[in-house]
């Protein structure tokens, strides 16, 4: 037996807009320099990845990514400063919640260690 912690953010209409999927996409953009590359790493369609990012940006009210159009050197995407800050805060909050949940689990179910 185990307990799991899942952090999901909802907007004012109670619509999910940010969780582990969009966070992984943003990390992937940092690693690959493109939304298409990040989506590919996750075996996700580019259109779905774009929709996830756009939904999160609409709910947050600021851009998470900035895209450059192709050309000789090719296009790409990168995180905005606000995007980097949001991702960092999300990951820190998620990790703190996981640790708190683990501690509570051990207190309430000590026989399950």
Task: Label each PLM-derived region with a short phrase.
Residues 1-14:
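Short, Lys/Arg-enriched N-terminal segment that forms or immediately precedes the first helix
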Residues 43-44:
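Central "turn" residue of the DNA-binding helix-turn-helix
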């Amino acid at each position: 037996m185990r307990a799991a912690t899942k952090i999901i953010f909802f907007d004012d209409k109670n619509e999910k807009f940010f969780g582990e999927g969009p966070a992984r996409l943003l990390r992937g953009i940092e690693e690959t320099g493109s939304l298409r590359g990040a989506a590919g790493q996750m075996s996700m369609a580019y259109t779905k990845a774009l929709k996830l990012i756009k939904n999160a940006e609409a709910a947050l009210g600021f851009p998470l990514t900035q895209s450059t159009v192709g050309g000789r050197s090719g296009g790409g995407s990168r995180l905005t400063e606000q995007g980097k800050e949001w991702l960092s805060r999300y990951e820190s909050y998620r990790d703190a919640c996981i640790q708190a949940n683990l501690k509570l689990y051990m207190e309430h179910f000590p026989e399950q260690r």
